[in-house]
């Protein structure tokens, strides 16, 4: 057996979504061993109306693209990154820890400075944006308010929801940015029209719209709240090994500064100007911190403080018609504001303090873009099934909030902050969850035999965790992992998936409990109950002339007497009168029983929708056994993430592949022939194969017993 699966590029993730490549055929006997498979502003000063940059023509252009998207070698936190020219010669080293550019929007012109706000320039329409995406293009967030500075080319944007995919940029600047002993590196990123520049000064346009980035030399203060540098002096070593000059169109894009004393990156400014296409100097606007503080502060209602010495709980009432509510404890009353006549920006943020606060929600609350932030432990309950929707919840580090409130259908609760949110409402929660940081523990209480904590769950950001505490808390197939993923801790519960929706290696299913879990991966491209089958009648035109239809559709006819059912195999069929129904290339006989015919139609749709291989890019970790039965459609499961479990993995029929993963480069279609692959490790107790083929492919390392029976095969390499 020597199977090769094609590599496919995903526009969603900007990289590889599948690859299986087996280069050598080695039959293996069962037994414990370590197995390895690897192959080896004057007239000359221009505001920037769109997005662009100029970079060196001597360095592979892919390097600048990878840099801006944290792809290739530019993973956040990486140090000692060697930069090479097109001939493979070292031209410099990035010594400081690589910045995390996730705070930069996919268009490059807006930077997240808190989970609910982003900054940019004002000119060229940047002060009037409607939305921005982070992580992947599909993670699109609506802007509800564009705050435009009256005296500066600066805008501050408020989002309708807390951003869960990205970590906001720090804006704390201490000391002088021009002090090269403190601020030892400056990086930028932007998107759009691009140029490469030769030493002669000749520039060549690179078509396409995409993020690029690079280094900038130590800036100087140039007055009018501006700092300046000359990254357009591309081959001057003072601009760093990846000099990147903001060209016409790079307005609003960020400049980051590395503080060697605090060992942190901070947002230094937003791009405003350059000195023309062939110029050298860029100007960045320093962030107007007082303006930012005042705008965000104005979006908060007064701080809510729980009096722990009172015998009374807080009572939260809300008048939806007026968009005004009250949170009251004894004679202490706090006024809050929510969505008013569809204006999400009318909703204010709420900040809660006071130890062990308890709130009883009395009315349904739509807080618009307003979010809740908890600095202390709180319990939020409802005695009358009231719901809450809004911008989301921030739970501060070291804080635990018990949340007994259900959401509303079609709306997601966005949770960020390093603290813990315990979901302990009652019955089926029609709302969804998006988590970007911290922990959410699910212990929803049962009502009407339903304890579904959320209708759907999306785990993103890389540092987030959803932990099951009660039974039947999730609909497994409605769990997905977004940008950089996070952890689903099944916590000793037995869980079955028919689909694994993970877009990158950050996704993880784990069991942290001492109670062993059984994880069943009964994967299917679709579920039968998701497939609708209608029965069409073959009319007289079809009888005499034939007709057109959709392959897979179910038809009925009494042409041969009692009702018979047929499945169409082609989009065009001939005359029934002339014997078309007997043509097995056009029709499949489905019998005379309607239920059996419908079931056959569903099975055919399941098979036809199956991909070449089921794929999981994430991790499987902890105290669990994993069972993979015979799968619907193409019974091949490729794991190119990693496995580290204390128990067994069992595969019935079909094929199982462990393999490494090609390094993802920004915007580049990967191939099996590329030289850079990431190693993956697979550690387990026993791999049990029953009439199944197992392949340990390139860049995969396995530690465990293999027990193969019933004509199973083992291939290494």
Q: Model regions: which residues?
A:
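Tryptophan-rich substrate-binding surfaces of secreted polymer-degrading and adhesive proteins
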Residues: 530-606
């Amino acid at each position: 057996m020597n199977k090769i699966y094609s590599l496919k590029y995903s526009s969603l993730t900007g990289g590889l979504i599948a690859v299986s490549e087996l280069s050598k055929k080695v039959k293996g006997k069962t037994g414990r061993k370590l197995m390895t498979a690897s192959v080896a502003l004057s007239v000359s000063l221009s505001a920037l109306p769109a997005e662009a940059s100029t970079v060196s023509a001597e360095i592979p252009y892919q390097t600048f693209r990878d840099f801006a998207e944290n792809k290739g070698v530019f993973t956040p936190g990486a140090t000692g990154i060697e930069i090479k020219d097109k001939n493979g010669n070292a031209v410099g080293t990035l010594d400081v820890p690589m910045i995390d550019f996730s705070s930069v929007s996919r268009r490059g012109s807006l930077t997240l400075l808190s989970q609910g706000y982003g900054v940019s320039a004002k000119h060229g329409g940047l002060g009037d944006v409607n939305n921005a995406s982070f992580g992947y293009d599909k993670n699109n967030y609506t802007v509800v308010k564009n705050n435009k500075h009256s005296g500066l080319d600066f805008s501050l944007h408020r989002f309708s929801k807390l951003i869960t995919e990205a970590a906001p940029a720090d804006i704390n600047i201490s000391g002088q940015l021009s002090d090269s002993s403190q601020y030892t590196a400056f990086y930028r990123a932007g998107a759009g029209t691009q140029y490469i520049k030769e030493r002669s000064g000749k520039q060549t346009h690179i078509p396409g719209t995409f993020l690029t980035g690079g280094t900038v030399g130590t800036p100087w203060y140039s007055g009018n709240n501006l700092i300046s540098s000359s990254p357009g002096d591309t081959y001057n070593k003072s601009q760093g090994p990846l000099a990147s000059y903001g060209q016409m169109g790079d307005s609003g894009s960020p400049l980051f500064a590395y503080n060697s004393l605090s060992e942190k990156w901070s947002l230094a400014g937003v791009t405003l100007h350059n000195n023309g296409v062939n110029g050298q100097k860029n100007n960045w606007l320093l962030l107007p911190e007082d303006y930012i503080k005042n705008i965000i502060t104005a979006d908060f209602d007064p701080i809510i403080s729980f009096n722990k010495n009172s015998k009374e709980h807080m009572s939260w009432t809300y008048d939806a018609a007026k968009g005004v509510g009250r949170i009251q404890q004894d004679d202490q009353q706090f006024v809050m504001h929510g969505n008013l006549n569809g204006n999400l920006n009318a909703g204010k943020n709420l900040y809660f303090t006071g130890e062990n606060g308890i709130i009883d929600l009395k009315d349904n609350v739509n807080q618009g873009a307003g979010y809740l932030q908890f600095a202390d432990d709180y319990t939020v309950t409802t005695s009358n099934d009231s719901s809450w929707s809004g911008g989301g919840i921030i739970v501060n580090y070291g804080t635990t909030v018990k949340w007994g409130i259900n959401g509303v259908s079609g709306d997601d609760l966005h949770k960020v902050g390093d603290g813990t949110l315990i979901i302990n409402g009652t019955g089926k929660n029609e709302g969804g969850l998006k988590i970007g940081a911290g922990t959410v523990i699910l212990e929803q209480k049962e009502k009407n035999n339903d304890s579904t904590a959320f209708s759907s769950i999306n785990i993103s950001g890389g540092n987030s965790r959803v932990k099951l505490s009660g039974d039947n808390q999730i609909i497994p197939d409605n769990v997905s992992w977004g940008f950089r993923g996070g952890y689903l801790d099944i916590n000793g519960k037995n869980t079955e998936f028919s689909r694994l929706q993970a877009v990158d290696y950050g996704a993880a299913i784990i069991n942290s409990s001492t109670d062993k879990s059984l994880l069943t991966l009964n994967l299917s491209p679709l579920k039968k109950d998701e497939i609708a089958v209608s029965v069409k009648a073959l009319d007289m035109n079809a009888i005499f002339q034939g007709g057109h239809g959709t392959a897979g559709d179910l038809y009925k006819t009494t042409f041969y007497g009692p009702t018979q059912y047929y499945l169409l195999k082609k989009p065009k069929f001939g005359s029934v009168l002339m014997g078309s129904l007997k043509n097995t290339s056009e029709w499949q006989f489905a019998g005379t029983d309607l239920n059996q015919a419908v079931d056959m139609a569903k099975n055919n749709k399941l098979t036809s929708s199956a991909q070449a291989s089921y794929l999981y890019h994430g991790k499987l970790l902890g105290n669990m056994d994993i069972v993979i039965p015979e799968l619907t459609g193409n019974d091949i499961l490729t794991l190119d993430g990693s496995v580290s479990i204390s128990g067994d993995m069992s595969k019935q029929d079909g094929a199982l592949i462990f393999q490494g993963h090609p390094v993802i480069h920004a915007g580049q279609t990967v191939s099996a022939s590329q030289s850079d692959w990431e190693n993956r490790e697979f550690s387990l107790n026993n791999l049990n194969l029953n009439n199944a083929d197992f392949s340990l492919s390139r860049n995969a390392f396995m530690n465990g017993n293999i027990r193969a029976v019933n004509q199973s095969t083992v291939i290494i390499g």
